């Protein structure tokens, strides 16, 4: 991890956002436009689209996260995606695929947190047990779990770089949104108003997961 540590995360992400062949963040850019400037698909040929390949998540129920496509992850173009959380035994599985051959992607690694999981998060989740994806910068894929963990993984290996516990299902708090990265910080909120959870937003340093601030 840390392949871009000499560069502010904003510079790194803006450079990626300027490349139409990448989908480097939730919503693609800081404005969350969700707009691609690719022009290969047109109104003239859209009716000829066919499925090229598929990758299963082994998780039923809601899927709302956008896969990220990131160039130069250890010299490879990689796709990162996160599943929903139908149960704690199969909750928020991250998969990383090598897109060097875009017609025949290969899974490089997968990750699921195995310890300290909280099954009570499943019935407390509002609007289904979905996950809305993750963010990438400084060689790390950062995402959150339904039961309240914010996790940074090494983009090349899938190994944990840091893990913090942020939301607590016993207090009605669950996480479905993707964390956002800006100015070398990771930002995350949570849901829980249906259970009268007291809201807050927190920021952690991207490098090591140390807490930068919390706002209630």
Residue spans of the language-model regions?
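Boundary at the C-terminal end of the N-terminal hydrophobic targeting segment
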Residues: 2-6
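Aromatic (tryptophan-biased) beta-strands that constitute blades/sheets of beta-rich domains
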Residues: 7-57, 103-123, 159-168, 210-216
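Repeat-blade elements of multi-bladed beta-propeller folds
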Residues: 23-27, 62-93, 123-150, 174-198
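Hydrophobic/aromatic beta-strand positions that recur at structurally equivalent sites within the blades
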Residues: 41-44, 97, 153-154, 204
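Hydrophobic small-molecule pocket/channel-lining residues, especially in calycin-type beta-barrels
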Residues: 85, 98-104, 125
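Short loop/turn segments that connect beta-strands within beta-propeller blades
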Residues: 99-103, 154-157, 206-208
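Short gly/pro/ser/thr-enriched loop/turn and capping motifs at secondary-structure boundaries
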Residues: 116-119, 151, 169-171, 195
């Amino acid at each position: 991890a840390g392949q871009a540590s000499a560069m502010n995360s904003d510079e790194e992400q803006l450079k990626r956002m300027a490349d139409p062949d990448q989908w480097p963040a939730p919503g693609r850019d800081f404005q969350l436009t969700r707009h691609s400037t690719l022009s290969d698909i047109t109104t003239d040929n859209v009716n000829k689209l066919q499925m090229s390949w598929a990758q299963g998540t082994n998780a039923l129920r809601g899927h709302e996260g956008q896969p990220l496509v990131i160039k130069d992850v250890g010299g490879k173009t990689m796709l990162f995606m996160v599943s929903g959380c139908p149960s704690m035994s199969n909750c928020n599985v991250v998969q990383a695929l090598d897109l060097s051959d875009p017609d025949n992607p290969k899974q490089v690694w997968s990750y699921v947190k195995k310890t300290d999981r909280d099954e009570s998060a499943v019935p407390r989740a509002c609007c289904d047990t979905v996950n809305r994806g993750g963010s990438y910068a400084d060689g790390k894929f950062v995402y959150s779990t339904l039961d309240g963990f914010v996790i940074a993984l090494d983009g090349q290996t899938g190994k944990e770089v840091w893990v913090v516990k942020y939301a607590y299902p016993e207090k009605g708090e669950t996480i479905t949104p993707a964390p956002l990265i800006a100015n070398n910080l990771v930002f995350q909120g949570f849901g829980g108003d249906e259970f009268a959870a007291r809201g807050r937003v927190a920021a952690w340093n991207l490098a090591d997961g140390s807490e930068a601030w919390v706002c209630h």
